[in-house]
Amino acid sequence: MRAFQVVEFASPIVPRDIPDPQPRASDVLVEVASCGLCHTDVHLQQGYISLGGDRKLPVSMTGLHTPATLGHEIFGHIMAFGPSSGLTAADVGRPVIVYPWIGCGHCAACLADRDNECPMPQSLGWQRPGGHGERVLVRDAKFLIDAEGLNSDAGIYACCGLTGYAALNKIVRRDGPIGIIGVGGVGLMALSIAKAMSLGPIVAMDIDAAKLMLARQSYGAELSFDTRSGNVGEQIQQATGGLIGVVDFVGAQQTVDLAVSVLRTGGTYVNVGLFGGALQTPLAILAQRQLVLRGSYVGTPAELRELVALARGGRLRAIPIQNEPMDSINEGLTRLRAGKVTGRIVHTHRQVTATQG
């Protein structure tokens, strides 16, 4: 099969011919039709995650080694399976969304179906080959979400959607305005989900005027603010009286400082972004304002199933999708790195034919 791989960090991804994976035991082989492009792929391709300042976490320390096949927003069809998978010939060809945040399978988190909390992750597109290959091996059928009736862009629910849904779920209170910092692909999806969950009013924050206009005019954000403004915190406080929750999809120093400054007493800050910010809040202030500070990393398999059910109910407004061939992945990464993508890029593989194994 053909796989687009990181052969050397910070260098272009290379198409390579590699052997087809073979399913054993409970494995399921999925033929990948499409795979969304995530900003995490940018970090992994460059070889490190910023920890703020000059500090960097090499991705090799997280279990990613070259050659690596990235891609975790996978939509495909069941192609083959191992003898203990619980599947039958009738399942071959069935469309699925792949839950990629697979854990070790043995720790307390995994046994409680909270694979995204596993300390020894085996995530597809990270520690294990992902959807930038034409076929992907999934350890267990329980990580496959039925996608009958959904289009091939639905793989974005596995990260772009799940990340927003799980982060919103972590906001403790629901009795006031909620802020979303960064209304790119994930933030725009979170806005769509927030509206489907009847949360709000929603305050959108970004540095891109076009994205803010889209959030307000097409996705229902009641208010929007350009975070480059010198007194944006004061503007938000004046307009809302403070926010009960902020989800930060950027995670830079400026965004965390802004988020904490506009929270009401008892408010919740949820960080998702990986842009290298550092949280510095006096403990006396933390106690006095009774703030809740949370990190959020994708979500659980159950949350993905809940999100897909929400999508099936027709309650989610689709975000803009740019469908492009997998051959253009390097160009897509360049645009994503430069912040020139509204919504999501979804790369499609060349036509392949599923067969039973």
Where are these regions (language model features)?
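N-terminal glycine-rich cofactor-binding segment
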Residues: 5-22, 39-80, 115-127
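Glycine-rich beta-strand-centered segment in the early N-terminal region that forms part
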Residues: 21-35, 50-106, 145-149
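Residues in the short beta-alpha loop(s) of Rossmann-like NAD(P)-binding domains
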Residues: 48, 208, 275, 299
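NAD(P)H dinucleotide-binding glycine-rich loop of Rossmann-like/cofactor-binding domains
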Residues: 58-72, 101-181
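Mid-domain Rossmann-like dinucleotide-binding core that forms the NAD(H)/NADP(H) cofactor-binding site
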Residues: 92-95, 134, 148-229, 234
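Glycine- and other small-residue-rich loops at beta-strand/loop junctions that grip anionic moieties
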Residues: 99, 157, 180-183, 204-205, ...
